[in-house]
Amino acid sequence: MAQISLTFPDGKAREFPAGITPAEVAASISTSLGKKAISASVDGRHYDLQWPIETDAKIAIHTMADEAQALELIRHDLAHIMARAVQELWPDVKVTIGPVVANGWYYDFDREETFTPEDLGAIEKRMKEIINAREAVKTELWERARAIAYYEERGEPFKVELVQAIPEDQSIRMYWHGGWQDLCRGPHLQHTGQVPADAFKLMSVAGAYWRGDSANKQLQRIYGVAFKTRDELKAYLHMLEEAAKRDHRKLGREMELFHLQEEAPGMVFWHPNGWQIYRTLEDYMRGRLRQAGYKEIRTPQVVDRKLWEASGHWEAYKENMFIVEVEEEHAKEKRINALKPMNCPCHVQVYNQGLKSYRDLPLRLAEFGSCHRYESSGSMHGLMRVRGFVQDDAHIFCTEDQIESECAAFIELLSSVYKDLGFDSFEIKLSTRPEVRIGSDEAWDKVETALENAIRKVGAAYEIDPGEGAFYGPKLDFKLTDAIGRKWQCGTFQVDPNLPTRLGAEYIGEDGAKHRPYMLHRAILGSFERFIGILIENYAGKLPFWLAPRQVVVASIVSDADPYVAEVVAALRARGVRAEADTRNEKINYKVREHSVGKVPVILAIGMQEVEARSVSVRRLGETRTESMGLDQVVDQLAADARIPG
């Protein structure tokens, strides 16, 4: 029998018979590893323990201690277990697909009756029975005709369609436990008992179209979440409760920040309070960019398709563009324009105006660019996913030798901005060269090394996401962590030698010859709309004083105090504090409750005692005690608190 060489993570290699499975490899190392093993990585591919290995390879055996692999398998197996439970409870239900998603999985079903909360409880109960039965998971490769015949015989039209869509040169893998079988690429655990029975929960039912196409049949999608332990599940469910309390859509109504309506789907109607947050954040970012050497520009929102064709976006992104057709005077045909979905091609046009020298580089062009992208109605979510948004976008034109220093400076800027906004921790992911790419390996080596050196230079931790870079260059993604532990990908840094080439960007080098600059795409917030949504939820509406739309309400206790209330408001406004008066004929406790719901950080209560002493009674949001302060003292303190950082 032919032999193959398998190399382990410690660099040691061993000879094995060709066709050996990872399960057999694990057992050959130790009996305990054979029992603990759940899957393997073979040449970087997540591999089922039952799959044979036919050639030399690098191998790593995974156990439940390997978080990423364990969760993927648990959630994937639960998708199959749930589908089986549904069909055992309601045999007429047709199954479709059930992928792993963030924190869990979903499965789409074709059923005439709507799934109810009681149905979800019954499904969960049956799932736990399947898990506790500890049935072996088996897999086989089938011929296409056999798979089609199998599903046609069982009346599963969606599975027939899936099999028919698989390229003829690809094998068709089947998995089953008990008597229930499903089409699946795998991998899976080795028996149902490896799934924690107390660490999952079915969450909700939603409508979904087959293959995401509204022209197709509408299905029912059941979502579930799963973790390795019961405590992790409880922590996640608690986080969801907290997230519901912090929902920016609910707080947006209470604080009178914004609204959305069906006449302009995915477009934000900013109210005065919300627009104040937006403008303050924009002023802050403008100041930080100015300090960092960026030059602010403004480019058109409606741009002819010719530019999008030249940049390559028309071919790759047309379906997500808003197209505007115009009948130009004396023109033979309509002019086709698009609302810009991104700013980068327009920034190259600004760069291309006038001859550039190496002495002009790096050139940092920033824009608070208004963009529009078509998002399906089902994917939109408050401020978090919209069709019209503004990016804190910038592009750095530089030489290859300047990439490292520009990247390091950007990471330091991003870190400082996040801290100012209340986010002390973030993660960096470096996405490296994909299999299909342009450029030489030498060029990729240089830019990937430049990014890694930049990260190390600023002392940041990072992880590598192999093969997930764009076809033209590597990128960094920055994920911040909010107050309840959720991670949000906001910042990006993308190296791009491609767009300058497509759009003819050049500079005269020190050698007197023409060269192509590198273009570095970068953003810190991502979009203002989404980031404001994140801020609202992170702070549960209790924004930092400098960012709060209504910073101070000066409330009268008696009407005789109204003139002094007006004086206090005027003194605060003169020092840049956003202050307003509340002299309504209402009790002070009513006013305090109302403004607390509106998340006003500071309420100054004024009665005749304060008038006579020229003082104020200070109540801060979330506190029950009050503090008496002199007028000059409180104005100085609040004016200092109101200053925009940086």
Curated annotation (Swiss-Prot):
<dbReference type="InterPro" id="IPR047246">
    <property type="entry name" value="ThrRS_anticodon"/>
</dbReference>
<dbReference type="GO" id="GO:0005524">
    <property type="term" value="F:ATP binding"/>
</dbReference>
<keyword id="KW-0067">ATP-binding</keyword>
<feature type="region of interest" description="Catalytic">
    <location>
        <begin position="247"/>
        <end position="544"/>
    </location>
</feature>
<dbReference type="Pfam" id="PF00587">
    <property type="entry name" value="tRNA-synt_2b"/>
</dbReference>
<dbReference type="GO" id="GO:0006435">
    <property type="term" value="P:threonyl-tRNA aminoacylation"/>
</dbReference>
<keyword id="KW-0963">Cytoplasm</keyword>
<dbReference type="InterPro" id="IPR012947">
    <property type="entry name" value="tRNA_SAD"/>
</dbReference>
<feature type="binding site">
    <location>
        <position position="521"/>
    </location>
    <ligand>
        <name>Zn(2+)</name>
    </ligand>
</feature>
<keyword id="KW-0030">Aminoacyl-tRNA synthetase</keyword>
<comment type="subunit">
    <text>Homodimer.</text>
</comment>
<dbReference type="GO" id="GO:0005737">
    <property type="term" value="C:cytoplasm"/>
</dbReference>
<protein>
    <recommendedName>
        <fullName>Threonine--tRNA ligase</fullName>
        <ecNumber>6.1.1.3</ecNumber>
    </recommendedName>
</protein>
<keyword id="KW-0648">Protein biosynthesis</keyword>
<feature type="binding site">
    <location>
        <position position="344"/>
    </location>
    <ligand>
        <name>Zn(2+)</name>
    </ligand>
</feature>
<feature type="domain" description="TGS">
    <location>
        <begin position="1"/>
        <end position="63"/>
    </location>
</feature>
<dbReference type="GO" id="GO:0046872">
    <property type="term" value="F:metal ion binding"/>
</dbReference>
<keyword id="KW-0862">Zinc</keyword>
<dbReference type="InterPro" id="IPR004154">
    <property type="entry name" value="Anticodon-bd"/>
</dbReference>
<dbReference type="InterPro" id="IPR006195">
    <property type="entry name" value="aa-tRNA-synth_II"/>
</dbReference>
<dbReference type="InterPro" id="IPR012675">
    <property type="entry name" value="Beta-grasp_dom_sf"/>
</dbReference>
<keyword id="KW-0436">Ligase</keyword>
<dbReference type="InterPro" id="IPR033728">
    <property type="entry name" value="ThrRS_core"/>
</dbReference>
<dbReference type="Pfam" id="PF03129">
    <property type="entry name" value="HGTP_anticodon"/>
</dbReference>
<comment type="function">
    <text>Catalyzes the attachment of threonine to tRNA(Thr) in a two-step reaction: L-threonine is first activated by ATP to form Thr-AMP and then transferred to the acceptor end of tRNA(Thr). Also edits incorrectly charged L-seryl-tRNA(Thr).</text>
</comment>
<comment type="similarity">
    <text>Belongs to the class-II aminoacyl-tRNA synthetase family.</text>
</comment>
<keyword id="KW-0479">Metal-binding</keyword>
<keyword id="KW-0820">tRNA-binding</keyword>
<dbReference type="InterPro" id="IPR018163">
    <property type="entry name" value="Thr/Ala-tRNA-synth_IIc_edit"/>
</dbReference>
<dbReference type="InterPro" id="IPR002314">
    <property type="entry name" value="aa-tRNA-synt_IIb"/>
</dbReference>
<dbReference type="InterPro" id="IPR004095">
    <property type="entry name" value="TGS"/>
</dbReference>
<dbReference type="InterPro" id="IPR045864">
    <property type="entry name" value="aa-tRNA-synth_II/BPL/LPL"/>
</dbReference>
<keyword id="KW-0547">Nucleotide-binding</keyword>
<dbReference type="Pfam" id="PF07973">
    <property type="entry name" value="tRNA_SAD"/>
</dbReference>
<dbReference type="InterPro" id="IPR012676">
    <property type="entry name" value="TGS-like"/>
</dbReference>
<feature type="binding site">
    <location>
        <position position="395"/>
    </location>
    <ligand>
        <name>Zn(2+)</name>
    </ligand>
</feature>
<dbReference type="InterPro" id="IPR002320">
    <property type="entry name" value="Thr-tRNA-ligase_IIa"/>
</dbReference>
<keyword id="KW-0694">RNA-binding</keyword>
<dbReference type="GO" id="GO:0004829">
    <property type="term" value="F:threonine-tRNA ligase activity"/>
</dbReference>
<dbReference type="Pfam" id="PF02824">
    <property type="entry name" value="TGS"/>
</dbReference>
<dbReference type="InterPro" id="IPR036621">
    <property type="entry name" value="Anticodon-bd_dom_sf"/>
</dbReference>
<dbReference type="GO" id="GO:0000049">
    <property type="term" value="F:tRNA binding"/>
</dbReference>
